[in-house]
Amino acid sequence: MTGIPTATISRLVTYLRILEGLEAQDVSRTSSNDLAERAGVTAFQVRKDLAYFGRFGTRGMGYTVPILKRELMRVLGLNQTWNVVIVGVGRLGQAIANYPGASDYQFQYVGLFDVNPELIGQSVRGLTVRHVDELRDFTRTTRVDMGFLAVPPERAQDAAQSLADAGVRGILNFAPTVIQPRLLDRSGQQEISDEWRAVIVENVDFLAGMKRLAFYILNPHLSAVETEENE
């Protein structure tokens, strides 16, 4: 499965959210036109996005909501358990740990890590905060699939490296900086480290979202549909 745009995956998440809402309202069928209207894209875009992963509907009859929801859950990997650790257990990290709904999608928090001696040893959501130096030993006995970073920007790269060193394959970075899957070797030349070769990094930047929002408020003629179709 290659050549799937990042924006397509983001839209699949949106379609899933819409389907969950429809199912909660006891709506049994939907269509590409209906999904498109609710998602703010075109029906063509909906069909194109879904076509990357197979055929889910019936021509002229649309989609069965529970079936399409189940298939999108499968495509997104939400039909299996994902073990998650959080590095950085300050206000943001604790808010992430206590955010409701993660367990509904099989995301299970298994470890919390920090460097602040005032936090180490405390209990958050039933988990004891450990020092980040214990991360590698922790992953030897506990499977960890993802790491969420909620650390200051100047510590983000080192924290991400700790996760990569421990064999964690996915990193969701909430620090206001871009994690680079590169390390400087002793000669000063950049190279991809072995630990980073299989690591997927998602950078979540709240300020970037605010900046995009400001742009679209100032440029309302540039609709979401127009920008998606020209990606």
Residue ranges and their predicted role:
Residues 92:
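Hydrophobic/small residue at the entry helix of a nucleotide-binding pocket
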Residues 101:
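Basic, low-complexity intrinsically disordered segments
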Residues 104-125:
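NAD(P)-binding Rossmann-fold cofactor-contacting core
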Residues 15-23, 127-230:
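Phosphate-bearing ligand-interacting subdomains
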